Regions:
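Conserved ABC transporter NBD signature motif
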Residues: 65-77
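Short helical segment in ABC ATPase nucleotide-binding domains corresponding to the A-loop/adjacent helical element
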Residues: 97-105, 115, 223
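Conserved signature/switch motifs of ABC ATPase nucleotide-binding domains
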Residues: 133-136, 154
């Protein structure tokens, strides 16, 4: 893996504001993400994981701290960030191919080359036969693959995944998450995954960042080294190191240290 950092966060803090009060959400969060790395972020519900992802995406501005990318101009780097949400947000009145091409159309880069690339991705993901179908004709797993293709067609350098598998049933979630992760790795993309599922984080990530409760801060970073390939989500979960990592994460999240 290349040692170059794609993204570095330094002392990021953020608060929610209302007419009555200010609620601290993030406090002095610092970490880096290396090129080609698959990073997972876990933490208690409501601790601000999605808020942190929105700041990385440039949708929110931090109150303090800085975000450094490998681009000399961070504003240019925003166009290279892909965001995949919990819901696929496929437009019901556009067919699958049209949904995939939505981003290029908005950015006015829907050239013949990009159109061909979109069709190549659909073929690679086994979805070329459903290009003319509409979202309500596809299964949940297929819809999430379409959502990933819609993100990948813009050729992002960094993928932000905000619990993209949580709406799927458990069995589908296992295989779709592993499939999508493997495709991201194959494309040599850098990814940050937000998840509540510790098993999912262990089976997919190269490294896991554990956040504390609100205001969230970095409690621990856990590098993941499994003795098996990650192609099969069932095999991954039977790796001899898996339970050890799970116990480490569980204690960090749910056991108070005295």
């Amino acid at each position: 893996m290349c040692s170059m950092n794609v993204l570095t966060l330094k002392n990021i803090s953020y608060s929610y504001h209302s007419l009555r009060e200010e609620t601290p959400a993030l406090k002095d969060i610092s970490f880096s993400v290396k090129e080609g790395e698959f990073l997972a972020i876990v933490g208690p519900s409501g601790c601000g994981k999605s808020t942190l992802l929105s700041i990385i995406a440039g949708l929110l501005a931090p109150e303090s701290g800085s975000i450094i990318t490998n681009s000399a101009n961070p504003a240019q780097e925003k166009t290279k960030i892909g965001y995949m949400l919990q819901k696929d947000h496929l437009l019901p009145y556009r067919n699958i191919y049209q949904n995939v091409m939505l981003g290029p159309e908005i950015q006015k880069i829907d050239t013949p080359q990009v159109q061909n690339y979109a069709k190549e991705l659909l073929k690679e993901y086994g979805l070329s036969d459903v290009m003319d179908k509409y979202p309500d004709e596809l299964s949940g797993g297929m819809r999430q693959r379409v959502a990933l293709i819609r993100t990948m067609v813009l050729n992002p350098t960094l993928l932000l995944l905000d619990e993209p598998f949580s709406a799927l049933d458990y069995q589908t979630r296992l295989y779709v998450s592993a499939d999508i992760c493997n495709r991201i790795r194959k494309a040599n993309k850098t990814a940050i995954l937000i998840t509540h599922d510790l098993s999912e984080a262990i089976s997919l990530a190269d490294r896991i960042i554990v956040l504390s409760g609100r205001p969230a801060s970095v409690k621990r970073e856990v590098p993941i080294h499994l003795s098996c390939k990650r192609d099969d989500p069932i095999v991954t979960r039977t790796a001899r190191e898996f339970n050890e990592y799970f116990e480490i994460l569980w204690k960090e999240l749910y056991h108070e240290k005295h």
